[in-house]
Amino acid sequence: MKRHLNDVVLVFLVFIFGVKLGKGQNTTIQVINVGVVTDVGTTASNLSLLAINMSLSDFYSSRPESRTRLLLNFADSRDDVVGAAAAALDLIKNKEVKAILGPRTTMQASFVIEVGQKSQVPIISFSATSPFLDSGRSPYFFRSTYDDSSQVQAISEIIKVFGWREVVPVYENNAFGEGIMPGLTDALQAINIRIPYRTVISPNATDDEISVDLLKLMTKPTRVFVVHMNRFLASRVFSKARETGLMKQGYAWILTNGVIDHLVLMNGTDIEAMQGVIGIRTHFPISEELQTFRSRLAKAFPVSELNIYGLRAYDATTALAMAVEEAGTTNLTFSKMDGRNISDLEALSVSEYGPKLIRSLSQIQFKGLSGDYHFVDGQLHASVFEIVNVIDGGGILVGFWTQDKGLVKDLSPSSGTTRTFSSWKNHLNPILWPGITLTVPKGWEIPTNGKELQIGVPVGTFPQFVKVTTDPLTHETIVTGFCIDFFEAVIQAMPYDVSHRFIPFGDDDGKTNVFDAVVGDTTILANRSSYVDFTLPYTTSGVGMVVPLKDNVARSSLIFFKPLTPGLWGMTLGSFFVVGFVVWILEHRVNSEFTGPPQYQISTMFWFAFSIMVFAPRERVMSFTARVVVITWYFIVLVLTQSYTASLSSLLTTQQLNPTETSIKNVLAKGGPVAYQRDSFVLGKLRESGFPESRLVPFTSPEKCEELLNKGPSKGGVSAAFMEVPYVRVFLGQYCKKYKMVEVPFDVDGFGFVFPIGSPLVADVSRAILKVAESNKATQLETAWFKNIDKTCPDPMNNPDPNPTVSFRKLSLDSFLLLFVAAATVCTLALLKFVICFLIQNRIILNDEFYRGKRMKEMWLKFMESDGESYISRVRSTCPQVLIQPREEDIDPING
């Protein structure tokens, strides 16, 4: 029945074309033979043949003045590579065709192109899409369609906008299927998308073989597949995928236009198996001409709908007719080859018309049914693709991809101007995914074969982080510690379940690649990242240097001099003399207690000044000015004595703990031994810093480290210990009264969880680490494992000095300078007042000529004698019992 239908179609085409050609023939028209190589007997070929005929009919009807007419010569390739080559040879040798339209497949075209190159006959294929058929192979090959690599950018941007990090290509095992892989791989690598493995399916594979390949996919974690194959193989693959459970929720399938462009040719059962698939479809701008052509085709061939083959065949035929018209009618002959002792291919005649025709084809430009039509380097170039979602028996448009804007919901000018990636909802309309769900697949999940993640746990030095014990009853291995609890919290914070099992091991390098992950106190290092992937760090970073503390204060019999600097001692002593002298000047003329023999006055002066420091002096101060000076000095002495007492108390009672070393440079220069944690990368860091092997001492426990530090280098110990900051926190929690972290000489990224390179878990676990770190859970875990440590000593990273050294500072003159300036000012003003009053009182001596030559002597005598005219003296003379009231201790108990 199928062959009968094909024969009917061919007769119909020949009849129609013969009528058209007969009507247009006259003596001025040159008939040009062209060949058509196709697989007669398929729906796609029949549509193409009908479109070719309609194209010629429309072309010559609209251009009756044309000087040429194309005469089609059909040849059946019989869906075979050799058959296509034989058909092309026959058309060139026997029909002397000037160009060939076809063949249909990539494999056929590869051979036919060689034939066209030999005979200089242009080959125009409207369905061979493999990038392997590069027009650079032959200037006589023209691809009247888009090559498969033109859609890889659209595919990669779909993958990127959904946040998928791994994809598995599933493609046909031939030149057509493999042709897209180089371009697809490059496009995915450019955006850091990993291809962990590939699935290659033979076009001749049985259903059982297809099922086996699909079952292998189920055992892998990746759930995003890019499918590139012909529609016949794709229908079988998706039928088996539905049977094996690969079309359930959580899976994502992306189809190339090799299948999506031909959905109209597929039956309902095949399309139903593809529910939820998204794909790339060639975009054809809607036009009146396209709608008219669709209606005409439906009337002429009602058994099928218009597909890409029909449009491409129509435009390719129009382009060939225009090129022939442009090339003219000269040099239509073939140059015959000597056929003796050579093969049929070598004996091909060479078309003299070919060079002119390819030049004309390269220059052709017009607006066809499929859009703007113009060959660039022998190919058409795509600028827009449609993104479709296979739903309800067809493809629903959900967006577009354009060369300028990337993924957009529509082609309106307001849809965006730059290729920016945000939420997929800003780029595409809602999509129904496999499993009939709107939830976007995350792109991977733990394989459905029941296997648990094998989590390696390195057994370390500090049990607070990882501790491995064995249950005495069940003999079951029990793994605990801060790292383990933190990992469990991270797993709970992830959006899906991850079944896992902890397996302790003794080496944390992770090079064996036996485990699915490593969880423990494993430090993130650059050299390790070359063979594993790390998550974000979940602890503080750095390698700390821990050194002993010692009391550096030497206590002697002269320690009471240390609170004050020599400058302050000198200023204080000098101030006592100055204040005593000023008070004597102000008081000796009005206060009898400051008079008497010179020796008595001098002793009284200094006695008064120094006695202020310990008790109230017995000498009373009478003048107001002197009282101001004394009160000021009282305040200064009070401040000085209180400060001195506090400083001396601190010096006598507090240990002055200072680190024995302050930097790694000092330790390296002194040449003493240092300790490091055994089996740690710290050993390499110390070697790089210049420490010789003989000076490096390993320790296996905090107790051993403390023993080495306590002994010191002189007794077989070490001068410093180097360990990672999290370990320092634990160590100082036990011994912070004796040791201190003084420096972080090496920067590292802290502890992280380890996964194989490319593991899709890394990004999800890192995001979960951030969630836990920002929640109360992290604080609760730290409290549970380090609460006793934090009570004993602060965190060395939050407080880098868990044992702040009580560094003694002597009291200096700078601290009290303002007080001494105030005292000096008061004394100066008091003296100035006294001098002015004294000069006014004795101005007669200064002005009277009687005292000429003896004024200084008289003034001195006046200065030294008592001032009986002063207010104080007059009050004392009238009320001596009030002003001179003896103190009780001065009264003789016998004589009264």
Swiss-Prot record:
It comes from the Eukaryota. Its main location: membrane. It is a multi-pass membrane protein. Residues 25-565, 642-815 are extracellular. GO terms for molecular function: calcium channel activity; glutamate receptor activity; ligand-gated monoatomic ion channel activity. Residues 1-24 form the signal peptide. The keyword Ion transport applies. One of its GO terms (cellular component) is plasma membrane. Expressed predominantly in roots. InterPro entries: ANF_lig-bd_rcpt, GABAb_receptor_plant_PBP1, Ionotropic_Glu_rcpt, Iontro_rcpt_C, Iontropic_Glu_rcpt_pln, Peripla_BP_I, Solute-binding_3/MltF_N. Pfam families: ANF_receptor, Lig_chan, SBP_bac_3. GO terms for biological process: calcium ion transport; calcium-mediated signaling; cellular response to amino acid stimulus. It is found in: Membrane. Glycans are attached at residues 26, 46, 53, 204, 267, 331, 341, 527. The chain crosses the membrane at residues 566-586, 596-616, 621-641, 816-836. Residues 587-595, 617-620, 837-896 are cytoplasmic. Keywords: Glycoprotein, Ion channel, Ion transport, Ligand-gated ion channel, Membrane, Receptor, Signal, Transmembrane, Transmembrane helix, Transport. Belongs to the glutamate-gated ion channel (TC 1.A.10.1) family. May form heteromers. Glutamate-gated receptor that probably acts as a non-selective cation channel. May be involved in light-signal transduction and calcium homeostasis via the regulation of calcium influx into cells. This is Glutamate receptor 2.4. It comes from Arabidopsis thaliana. The gene is GLR2.4.
